[in-house]
Amino acid sequence: MSEPGIPKGRPRHWLEYISTAFAVIISLISLWVAIETERANRQMVAAASWPMLQVGSSSVDDKGDSVILFRVTNTGVGPAKVRSFELFYKKKPMTGAVQLIRTCCKPDFTRSAPEEEDRKDFFITGGVPGNVIRAGETDTFMQMGLGTANAAVWRALNTARNNFITYRICYCSVFDECWINTVRGRNQLDPTPVDKCPVPKVGYVE
């Protein structure tokens, strides 16, 4: 005699199928929530470290003196690593400030230290590539004061900066998300995302 019991091959009750399907659905929902939460967290961290570099120039310094200033400002919320910087005069790349002045304004221009420290016709330059610019900071990479000895050069450079000088800057966040900005003036709100910054054929040094 066979012992009484549940016969082999008994069809599963429909409730068992529903329970199994429900468990699978719950697992999928939990996985989706976890993925979306992780993505949202990454977006929040990226947004909290997002840099925005804007290149600009002016003809008056913070004291109101006649000084031509070329600056890079980080208007974002995170630090920016400057990978490359290019400056063009009439679409021709410049290697530095001296070449720019010789091309735009005075062919025989030479850099010379002023005899007096308080002379107004000073000329100061600095590099841009390789710098880390923190949020809210400004790097000034060229300054030229207006004096009696350099009035013609100063005015020529002022005309050039308003009409013929353009830039291309590539920078990255601390998470190595990178952007290229090529727009002049205030409309620099939509830099182009890139996988990595290209190496320029002619980079601006100083």
Each model region followed by its residue ranges:
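Sequence contexts marking disulfide-bonded cysteines in secreted/extracellular proteins
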Residues: 103-106, 171, 179, 196-198
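Short solvent-exposed loop/turn micro-motifs enriched in small/polar/acidic residues
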Residues: 63, 124, 162-164
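Intrinsically disordered, low-complexity segments enriched in small/polar residues
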Residues: 3, 74, 124-125, 134, ...
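Low-complexity, serine/threonine/proline-enriched polar segments
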Residues: 117, 123-128
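Terminal connector regions
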Residues: 129-193
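Membrane-proximal alpha-helical anchors
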Residues: 2-107, 112-120, 199-206
